[in-house]
Amino acid sequence: MGKIIGIDLGTTNSCVAILENGNVKVIENAEGARTTPSIIAYTNDGETLVGQPAKRQAVTNPQNTLYAVKRLIGRRFEENVVQKDIQMVPYSIVKADNGDAWVEVKGQKMAPPQISAEVLKKMKKTAEDYLGEPVTEAVITVPAYFNDSQRQATKDAGRIAGLDVKRIINEPTAAALAYGLDKAKGDHTVIVYDLGGGTFDVSVIEIAEVDGEHQFEVLATNGDTFLGGEDFDIRLIDYLVDEFKKESGINLKGDPLAMQRLKEAAEKAKIELSSTQQTDVNLPYVTADASGPKHLNVKVSRAKLESLVEDLVQRTIEPCRTALKDAGLDVSDIHEVILVGGQTRMPLVQKTVAEFFGKEARKDVNPDEAVAVGAAIQGAVLAGDVKDVLLLDVTPLTLGIETLGGVMTGLIEKNTTIPTKKSQVFSTADDNQGAVTIHVLQGERKQAAQNKSLGKFDLADIPPAPRGVPQIEVTFDIDANGILHVSAKDKATGKQQSIVIKASSGLSEDEIQQMVRDAEANAEEDRKFEELAAARNQGDALVHATRKMITEAGDKATAEDKATIEKALGELEVAVKGDDKAEIEAKMNALSQASAPLAQKMYAEQAQQGEGAAQGEQAKSADDVVDAEFEEVKDNK
């Protein structure tokens, strides 16, 4: 069995890790970094860039550079958070035929799982380059508060990337695994506070020793899947835009290039203000008007940044309170607080968390890598390489069905340990009702319409009977990934209907298969592009070497030699500018043949010169010989 890698598929950055010889190794990518920006760019020459190369060109290509796409995964276009996102990003978010939020690049609509799959492919390749063998299996993390649609969409992204997703695991749970595996024996309860680039989660986790086994039991989880570092950046960007408008009268909001530069500068300033009290945001030539170019230069203090984002930090406290209440615990019952996610490096976040929980958070957990490390440990557990770990996770939201009067009736309550199965008997609402529609919902509201619709299916051919007589047993079954399977059975006839919830939105099996094929075709395209680039480089090198040879040959090259070589050179230079690899190789061969006679002539001449020089050296050394007398000395020891 091959290795099962652990992937933290983040909103802002992603990370991949593997368990090797009992230790978890976070794997560096091709650029030498341990985390990879979750950014994908589509260039004008048809190349797809992922990670740092995509981030570097974002300023000049904002409309075709996609970031924070995880915030759209498994979401409907009409959702408020999506409408809010549309106002914040320079790329185009569009409504798919099924009502989902998709993105559009260069006139082509793409599903968020397709975009996330590009990041996963980069993670997969990073692991393969390190291990020297193909990788096909992975554990991928998601925010604990992701609903069923978002989990399913993440699994789909893995399939599109060519990965068999062995388990979807919650990010705070993964971080607790990374923290708790090597800790002292005995039971203790930890809070994992995970504030990442786009999502916020908090989980109450009990780490216990049961018969020599590490047991990680999630007692409760809560969160906000649209709150993270990106929102902190936006507050600072808005402030910088306002300051610039006050000074110059120009609103930068309508200029995508300027806004992309501002985004980068704001992120950099935010990071700097975690370790300094003040920083300058300096963007020369940010825009221009009739009077000439304009420069942005704004001083930002840590206090100013904190005042801009204070309410965002406070928004994280209510989920903490709810999670504790759901777990039936007080703040005093918490032994350790673990901070995960890059945004937790902000001093205000650390101070607020410490004040609420009455204790400083631990500093020995790497907030950027802990989640991937935990995913790798879970991968090793599934592969059988780690034996003494048991993970008991929960479903984050209540699952139920719509019943008479538009009411949501819960079958599986939030924070129920998974996997789990629950059945309940329902009946018909009308006399002689021949079919019932099972409308599956997820959420905490009593009104069905206020919750997330996961899907509908019909149970037909119910024998005629007065209302309330037929007995229809609805069974909810949640697997270890937190993904729901629902069935309904007429107890009188034994007739059964079931679905794996694919959400009323989501990707169909055909769409996923098509995207898998597209991804494979893209991999082939990428390979061809690399080969073409290599051929162009070889062609350029040969042109350079041949011109150098002609220069060095001087008078030794006849006019005929030069004419033949120049013709072949010109043809190769034209071929190198084209896109035909075979043509480049053919013209390289032609140039090699055309220049061969001159090369041989020069080689022969060099050889002759070499021989002449060698003979001269020999004669010289013969003249320099000095006769000497030697006396043998015997060494008596």
UniProtKB/Swiss-Prot annotation:
Residues 604-619 have a biased composition (Low complexity). Keywords: ATP-binding, Chaperone, Nucleotide-binding, Phosphoprotein, Stress response. Disulfide bonds: none annotated. One of its GO terms (molecular function) is ATP binding. Residues 604-637 are annotated as: Disordered. The modification Phosphothreonine is found at T199. InterPro entries: ATPase_NBD, Chaperone_DnaK, Heat_shock_70_CS, HSP70_C_sf, HSP70_peptide-bd_sf, Hsp_70_fam. It holds the Pfam family HSP70. Gene3D superfamilies: 1.20.1270.10, 3.30.420.40, Actin, Chain A, domain 4, Substrate Binding Domain Of DNAk, Chain A, domain 1. Acts as a chaperone. HAMAP family: DnaK. NCBIfam families: PRK00290.1, PRK05183.1, prok_dnaK. This is Chaperone protein DnaK. It comes from Pseudomonas paraeruginosa (strain DSM 24068 / PA7) (Pseudomonas aeruginosa (strain PA7)). The lineage of its organism: Bacteria, Pseudomonadati, Pseudomonadota, Gammaproteobacteria, Pseudomonadales. The gene is dnaK.
